[in-house]
UniProtKB/Swiss-Prot annotation:
First-listed, main subcellular location of the protein, grouped into a coarse class: cytoplasm
Family: Belongs to the HCP family.
Origin organism lineage: Bacteria, Thermotogati, Thermotogota, Thermotogae, Kosmotogales
Gene from which this protein is expressed: hcp
Job description of the protein: Catalyzes the reduction of hydroxylamine to form NH(3) and H(2)O.
Location(s) in or outside the cell: Cytoplasm
HAMAP family in alphabetical order: Hydroxylam_reduct
Official protein name in the record: Hydroxylamine reductase
CDD domains: HCP (cd01914)
Catalysed conversion reaction: A + NH4(+) + H2O = hydroxylamine + AH2 + H(+)
Taxonomic superkingdom: Bacteria
Organism encoding this protein: Kosmotoga olearia (strain ATCC BAA-1733 / DSM 21960 / TBF 19.5.1)
Keywords associated with the record: 4Fe-4S, Cytoplasm, Iron, Iron-sulfur, Metal-binding, Oxidoreductase
Cofactors (names): [4Fe-4S] cluster; hybrid [4Fe-2O-2S] cluster
Annotated Gene3D superfamilies: 1.20.1270.20, 3.40.50.2030
Annotated positions binding hybrid [4Fe-2O-2S] cluster: H249, E273, C317, C409, C437, C462, E497, K499
Amino acid sequence: MSMFCYQCSETLNGKACTVAGVCGKDPETSNLLDLLVWVLKGISFWATEARKLGVDDPEVNLFVAEGLFTTITNVNFDPESIGKKIEKAFALRERIMKATKEAYKEQYGKEFSKEVPEAATWYVPGDLSVWELKGAEVGALSTKDEDIRSLRELLTYGLKGIAAYTDHAYILQKFNDEILHFLQEGLAATLDDSLTVNDYVALVMKAGEFAVKAMQLLDEANTSRYGNPEITEVYTGTLPGPAILVSGHDLLDLEEILKQTEGKGINVYTHGEMLPAHAYPELKKYKHLVGNYGTSWYNQQKEFAQFNGAIVMTTNCIQKPLESYKDRIFTTGLVGWPGVKHIPNRTDGGQKDFTPVIEKALELGGLEEKPGKKIVIGFAHEQTAQVADKIIEAVKAGKIKRFVVMAGCDGRAKEREYYTEMAKRLPKETVILTAGCAKYRYNMLDLGDIDGIPRVIDAGQCNDSYSLVVTALRLKEAFGLDDINDLPISYDIAWYEQKAVAVLLALLYLGVKGIRLGPVLPAFLSPNVLKVLVENFDIKPISTVEQDLELILQGK
């Protein structure tokens, strides 16, 4: 076995990737990422001990979040870049360890004597080959008990999603140290062999609580800078002229690209999870933000090859770039791929310098005109609140009989055609609530509207599942219900990676029951852990469209 990874929905044969990742990860990259997570756990051990002594290190706190984000599926495939992260992790671990020991001695008059896990001390100087070997030792399989392993991985993947949302918020200057501290609490707990199954279940539920907080923080970050999303029509065709395509999730990167291209005759397009950017007033004001090109991440090799412009990957999801466009794709932030040009991070409060991207776009000459339809987006919670009376009236009049939450991720699996078919076959009295790239399975279908309310209400990116939760809670209040599960809402969720795990844990924390999860159940859930989720939350796998549709319409 060269590697072991089962953190995403596409893991090989629904079990694990052990020779190479379906995502494109080679064993070296996979094992280095496992080592990075392990060292982050070691940092977290010291950081949680330090806070008990009144010591807190903001740089360490944020680094743990950035490090976790780096290990999410389809973020960083570059061993050298990951190696630099590991080197910095060792340095910060040494710093917080020293600060902890000094504070302990000052407070208690003796040396720190608590048992220290290996992850908090192991170090071999910068050698990727040695680090790779160590990474292979300390991954998921290092926990022998199947149920403890399952819960530790469920917790860790939830923490990765929380870290991603929190990191995005911090980039936009919205801070919540409590979330960063919980990331460390959770990571440190995975090193504690004294914890029981019940202890880990409690931590998993606590992760759901902090997933809600992280999504709320990012919602505040996005809306305070760019305004509340508005109902907006987005063009899906192309216009003639030089072009830049921005994929990923980072709105600040898009904003800086828009600023730096203003007046240069370059059209800017979004791709994938950047589609919701068009709904924000402070982004849609740029006239050269002209449309959304393509669909979700897994189609990028075909779509990028046909896009004769510069391409910027701001966060996940990147796939192996084809030679046909490798010289015109750029990574930035935490994203990395060997041999792909990288736009460095901001320094001294300035902007990133996207000059190489702009020059490449101008050099290429650009796109030809190609017609496309318009799609409607922008139904985040504030915008939805403005049409709430209309929605409530439609429900009371029987014109809307059920809402179906079909949020989450898209992916390559043929089984995901289920979501397209479900959208087509849902009766005209149903409304789909969506967020995340799962929307691309049905957002180009002509599903019509109900008294002017679109039958696909798109709240935004995957983190904007928070908006769907807020909307559901407002509807519960409006209808005078005691339980969110009494609403005429069914949950038919598609998952792919670790941010979706965080969203799932958030829904469970809020008490949502009866979630259908597809296209497959996570491989990292042991039979016993799955049994707990089924018994307590009625989680179930998707079945056939015919069977699930019948049950959904019955509220089951």
